[in-house]
Amino acid sequence: MERGYLTLFRVRGVPVRAHWTLPLGALLLSGGRFAPGLWVGVLLVVALHELGHALFVHRFGLVNLGLDLTGFGGRCRWAGHPSEVQRAAIAWGGVLAQLALLIPALGVALFLPMPRSPFLAELLEAFTRTNAILIAFNLIPIKPLDGAEAWPLFGHLRRQRARVKKWKQKLAPQTLREALDEADRKNLH
């Protein structure tokens, strides 16, 4: 154990670690009751969230250093120099991964009978209600939550679109002028 973390496994060389507070957080989340399906489900939701960040980190050519799971959430550790848009997209990666689980889980919850197994019922609760609550919580625009870096994505994209539009306007008259000159040359010859 290193600084309270135990390396569970590695994904492409990237360590996935659990902190000693993980069981404590699970117990608090379930209100002190024995709820192994909820515990496993929330662990999977948090792990999926962090993997979502890691996927975007990898996609942008940055370096994944590790995924840490604690009793109070998780953390994707990475290094590199992303653009503002990339940093915001990485922040959205966790929530997008959670949504990829939430949508089909809601379909199961809405259209299939409730599981008879307490473990499966708790697991479904973790994948739906608890997952939705964690998504909403993570999107609060306050550091260290993802919302602090995720929501600015729309402002970055709007500014980027305005810059592209400005360049198009500068280039369009020149392009039109060149096209007219070309047409005149063809008509004269």
Model-identified regions with their sequence ranges:
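Hydrophobic transmembrane alpha-helices and their immediate loop junctions
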Residues: M1-H189
